[in-house]
Amino acid sequence: MKTTTAQPSPSTSDFSGHTPMMAQYLGLKANHPDTLLFYRMGDFYELFWADAEKAARLLDITLTQRGQSAGQPVVMCGVPFHAVDTYLARLIKLGESVAICEQVGEVGASKGPVERKVVRVVTPGTLTDSELLNDKSESLLLAVHAGTRNFCGLAWLSVTGAELRLAECPADALEAWIARIAPSELLYSAEVTPAFEQRLKAARAATPFTLSIRPAWQFDGGLGERKLSEQMGSNSLAAWNAESLANAHAAAAALLGYAEHTQGRALSHVQRLSVERDGDLVELPPTTRRNLELVQTLRGEDSPTLFSLLDTCMTGMGSRLLKRWLLSPRRDRGEAQARLEAIAALQSTVLGGTAAPWRTLREQLKNTSDVERIAARIALRQVRPRELLALRLALAKAEQLAPALPASGELLGGIIERLAPPSGCADLLASAIKPDPSALVRDGGVIATGHDAELDELRAISENCDDFLLKLEVSERERTGISNLRVQFNRVHGFYIEVTQSALSKVPDNYRRRQTLKNAERFITPELKAFEDKALSAQDRALAREKWLYEQLLDALQPSVPALTQLAGAIATLDALCALAERSHTLHWRAPSFVSHPCIEIQQGRHPVVEARLAEKSSGGFIANDTQLGPQQRMQVITGPNMGGKSTYMRQVAIIVLLASIGSHVPAAACRLGPIDAIHTRIGAADDLANAQSTFMLEMTEAAQILHSATAQSLVLMDEIGRGTSTFDGLALAAGIAAQLHDRSKAFTLFATHYFELTEFPATHHCAVNMHVSATEAGRDIVFLHEMQPGPASKSYGIQVARLAGMPAAVVNHARQALEALESQHAQTRAQVDLFAPPPAAETPMASAVESALAALDPDAMTPREALDALYALQKLNTRERGAA
């Protein structure tokens, strides 16, 4: 990459001495000091000084130098306007923000540079362009307020969505909330404590996002409440149960202010408000989402995951909604039950053997455009002509959906009601937009013929130019008798009549010479000059007229935005339900049933992703297994060889519970599920070097979090806990953790271990049972049967697994001999230690003199003076005690 010597940016407060254009640039840059400013100049967006150096480095484009301003070299680089989306995408991916500055004035309309202004700011959390967005994922902007009373306020939205969400969470749960929301950008106050800021930065390790600092005054609860009321068009937030959330209101104030600033206007399309509270959702900590590979594999890939298996949606709207369902299962079974009933209706076939409704509906949904995002871009006045054409086609498709939809149940009935397109919208789009419009309004060719008489006339002048010239040429030849006279046009000299040297004597008096050539002369006539003025201006006037008409069209579409947003929600819900119906049919899943008593009962359960991968590779069928957990059997202690299927079994149970909780059918012959409040997992191990945490430290940290959080309604997966330290340490810790989960948390627990000593745990803990994954030996080889069977495993088969992995024969033989010696020695010296005995009760310490004196005080009966005297007395007593000690 070509570079020049780095130059500091000029002062943005003193523009004296700068050229008019650079003074204009610096004035705009002063309002966006921390943002790259794309300054439109003709066919390029230019960047100057420090912005240019940064952009050139990040984008690997040429950095150059052109002239001077105020005695300083003007360092610059640029990108073509027609390719700007490509460069924006690269910058946004790097966490940068870009202010887009356009020419808004007419060239030559005033002295000095053409008028320019920043029309929008593109940041990672406020993306609106379809080229910059992922069809299947929301780009969320989150604001966090440090809050009071040890609570944090959160407010978040997608600028291209229609819903704003609020929450207040305990300060110690903030990281979990951030991880679940998974924002693209997080806003926080410039006046938070260093410790709080460090927590936000640390949270990026689990969920990468851009941090943006905002002035503290923007986080104002009163301002937020007013903004929310205005946004919802109401004097009170009581209808949304959002009136007493001062911390969340403060976050919403900053959120809305920032979003409006970046878009250059209010978010009129955001008209839904919801409040999420602790206890509403089934908790899925970051470790659970990672270990179950819900939306990303352990290698960071998008497939194969549970979401990639589920997502056969026909629209981006449906995919995004399905992902939200998957990551936000609700404890209240009402929504899940409604979805199960809807899936049943979509799968039912009417008498006569016609196709199930989900098949017909999916065909109709195919190629439906993203109505949700198009509606948002209409409201933000950023929609492109071809998106409006796509919207018209989507509205036509929507009209076909309701008749094919069974009116069964409240959920499907509500979808039918919301599928009604806004009145007159499709007709307006059909009359206004060409069937094949240009990509951009600035290119013309967008407004349909017949929509505006003045535009049609201007187009006719421009389009009929060739016909006029041909007719003029014929008439002039007849009038002058010059047979080779030609009427033509070029961009330099405009329209002209060309006559060869031999015919110049026949040129009429009204011909005025325009250009002399070697063998000919070119002339202009008053008639041709008048046409030239009209024709050349007609194209510019037609383009200006089209731009004006397009703005008028956007004005006319604004009242339809709420109905379009409602329609988008209905299409998304229907699409997601049809995808679940298709998955159930194709993968042979069954509907779960919900019960009020605690249980997880699964017959012939399967891991859906592993099963699908086996089918792809033709590697044989998946071995299904039963699971029985209830009040009398809350824990399974699972033993068996590596590669035997312990982790797969544990994960499949969690996935089946999760799928049932979102209202999906499940990969099992049958499933009964009681109340579930969380799914916790401690599976696998990896160092966190960035945060100076070893494998074992991470293991213990995650286990501690589970022990503090798990309840009797939680599902806990513990896989090989205690591996990262010495054998005795690990065994002792594993025993203690198992006892805590069994005796105190009473959570449904799948506890996989290689510590054979733990198979004695169920003997003293009546709600625990031993289970093992079966395997058999064939000579010196091992055959994995992948079946869960009662009782402990007879051996771990570690040496056989090492042999299968390709370990050198000498190493395997040495290990086998060493194992035999160790087992013999262990059998002779094994101590009878009760790993599962409760710890001895701690002695109750005697109360100190200070504690006794403090307990004797009655603060309510004391005057302020008496309280102060008592405090001094306690201080003296404490000093004496410390001295005696």
From Swiss-Prot:
Family, as annotated: Belongs to the DNA mismatch repair MutS family.
Biological function: This protein is involved in the repair of mismatches in DNA. It is possible that it carries out the mismatch recognition step. This protein has a weak ATPase activity.
GO CC term, one of those recorded: cytosol
The protein's name: DNA mismatch repair protein MutS
Residues the record lists as binding ATP: G640, P641, N642, M643, G644, G645, K646, S647
SUPFAM superfamilies for this protein: DNA repair protein MutS, domain I (SSF55271), DNA repair protein MutS, domain II (SSF53150), DNA repair protein MutS, domain III (SSF48334), P-loop containing nucleoside triphosphate hydrolases (SSF52540)
Biological process (GO), any one: mismatch repair
